[in-house]
């Protein structure tokens, strides 16, 4: 069985400064994300053993652990691609038009997304996703690493609101972190995800 691996980043840890510090990015990538990758592989190994032993209680436990750690791995893999030292500004083209259609304007979208991030209780993510059934953009608060985002949503843009993503630099002032995040958003990546979602995901759930 192939194992999950920690992806390399497209930029150096310090490349997002002053908006997100190199120290945070290094710890975030080599410690936190790496822990989720290990957790996925450990859960898969334990799940295989539990199935061989027909231990249903252990199967359910490790399926739950797999969902959490795989969620963490997927979320962070998107996170690193969503960021760029050349980011910021606003989206263009079809993505910009879709944002205007769904939210009224980019400024209204940004306000709604920021409110989702700043208002999240506990740990989680704010997510801009594409609803493959309704063919529309929606925002969500993702709880922990895998809860509260419905099936059929393809994530396009995420901001990590776990404290490890910002506390060393911004302490408890989450709003300053979210404001800084907009300076490093890789809209080219978000546009690429949007194009793939709209062209490849139609009919996958409801044919």
From Swiss-Prot:
It catalyses: 2 superoxide + 2 H(+) = H2O2 + O2. It comes from Mycobacterium avium. Binds 1 Mn(2+) ion per subunit. Destroys superoxide anion radicals which are normally produced within the cells and which are toxic to biological systems. The keyword Manganese applies. InterPro entries: Fe/Mn_Superoxide_Dismutase, Mn/Fe_SOD, Mn/Fe_SOD_BS, Mn/Fe_SOD_C, Mn/Fe_SOD_N, Mn/Fe_SOD_N_sf, SOD_C_sf. One of its GO terms (molecular function) is superoxide dismutase activity. This is Superoxide dismutase [Mn]. The keyword Ribosomal protein does not apply. Its EC number is 1.15.1.1. Mn(2+) binds at residues 28, 76, 160, 164. Gene3D superfamilies: Fe,Mn superoxide dismutase (SOD) domain, Iron/manganese superoxide dismutase, C-terminal domain. Keywords: Manganese, Metal-binding, Oxidoreductase. It is an enzyme of class 1 (oxidoreductase). Its cofactor is Mn(2+). Belongs to the iron/manganese superoxide dismutase family.
């Amino acid at each position: 069985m192939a194992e999950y691996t920690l992806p390399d980043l497209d930029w150096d840890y310090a490349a997002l400064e002053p908006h997100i510090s190199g120290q945070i990015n290094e710890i975030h990538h080599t410690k936190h994300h790496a822990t989720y990758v290990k957790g996925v592989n450990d859960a898969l190994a334990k799940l295989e053993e539990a199935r061989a032993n027909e231990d249903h209680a252990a199967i359910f436990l490790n399926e739950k652990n797999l969902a959490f750690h795989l969620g963490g791995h997927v979320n962070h893999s998107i996170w690193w691609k969503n960021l760029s030292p050349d980011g910021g500004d606003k989206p263009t083209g079809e993505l910009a038009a879709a944002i205007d259609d769904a939210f009224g304007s980019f400024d209204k979208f940004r306000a709604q997304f920021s409110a989702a991030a700043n208002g999240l209780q506990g740990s989680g993510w704010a997510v801009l996703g594409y609803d493959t059934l309704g063919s529309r953009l929606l925002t969500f608060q993702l709880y922990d690493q895998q809860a509260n985002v419905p099936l059929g949503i393809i994530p396009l843009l995420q901001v990590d609101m776990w404290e490890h993503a910002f506390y060393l630099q911004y302490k408890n002032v989450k709003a300053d972190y979210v404001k800084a995040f907009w300076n490093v958003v890789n809209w080219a990546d978000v546009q690429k995800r949007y194009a793939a979602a709209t062209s490849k995901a139609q009919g996958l759930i409801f044919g």
